[in-house]
């Protein structure tokens, strides 16, 4: 398993279940960057996955930058309730998360190609 395949399994597969945020994965490898970028909606149902990302980030001393981008007219009531519950401002904006996979620490044996 290569380093990127490991990242795919521990991060991107989680993203496939997550339909609440726009997630931008950045890397020096621009082809990889494009391949691993996903966008989602309906954040209200996915607080657990956001917490999971926070845990991965902390374990890897990685900063997940969260900002609000792009006004959306499609906010469902559940989304508004989630923002209210979590005391976030700008409920009309979806968050954007940026993950720099080049900064994630990967076990040496996983970095090596099979």
Model region roles, listed by residue range:
Residues 1-27:
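Acidic helix/loop or adjacent segment enriched in Glu/Asp that either coordinates divalent metal
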């Amino acid at each position: 398993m290569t380093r990127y395949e490991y990242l795919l399994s521990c991060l991107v597969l989680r993203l496939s279940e997550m339909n609440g945020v726009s997630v931008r994965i950045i890397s020096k490898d621009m082809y990889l960057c494009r391949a691993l970028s996903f966008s989602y909606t309906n954040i209200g149902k996915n607080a657990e996955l956001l917490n999971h990302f926070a845990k991965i980030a902390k374990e890897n001393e990685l900063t997940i930058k969260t900002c609000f981008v792009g006004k959306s007219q499609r906010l469902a009531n559940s989304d508004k309730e989630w923002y209210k519950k979590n005391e976030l401002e700008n409920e009309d904006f979806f968050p954007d998360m940026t993950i720099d996979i080049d900064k994630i620490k990967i076990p040496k044996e996983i970095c090596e190609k099979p």
